């Protein structure tokens, strides 16, 4: 793979795909049923949301961590301080540490 800055993450037919800047799929990762994806600001990892959980992936396609927040997931993204915001369907959610532990609910 080239530099990780050359890649984006798209959802295609319910599966996260690592793509080049032109949208050509390089690798499909994770389970089917993905709803959205977001890249960390340092581009070290990307997070993929599913209905009941969130997965953090590396650019080689390997999974770094699975977080099961205990609620239906509306979406997830990286915030500062190496935390992940997981939004709950219907409102609320939580800030989760990179290791998967809950930091703060909202």
State what each model feature region is.
Residues 1-4, 31-43, 69-81:
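Repeated scaffold domains used in trafficking and secretory/extracellular systems
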Residues 2-23, 28-32:
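N-terminal targeting and processing segments
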Residues 4, 12-14, 21, 42, ...:
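Short loop/turn segments that connect beta-strands within the blades of beta-propeller domains
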Residues 24-30, 62-68, 102-106:
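A short beta-strand motif characteristic of beta-propeller blades
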Residues 53, 59, 63-69, 73-77:
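A structural signal for the main folded, soluble domain(s) of proteins
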């Amino acid at each position: 793979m080239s530099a990780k800055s050359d890649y984006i993450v798209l959802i295609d037919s319910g599966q996260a795909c690592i793509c080049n800047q032109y949208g050509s799929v390089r690798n499909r990762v994770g389970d089917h049923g993905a709803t959205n994806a977001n890249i960390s600001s340092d581009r070290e990892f990307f997070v993929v949301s599913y209905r009941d959980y969130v997965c953090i992936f590396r650019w080689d396609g390997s999974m770094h961590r699975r977080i099961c927040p205990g609620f239906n997931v509306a979406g997830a993204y990286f915030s500062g301080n190496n935390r992940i915001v997981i939004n709950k369907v219907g409102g609320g959610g939580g800030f989760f540490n990179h290791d998967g532990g809950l930091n703060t609910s909202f």
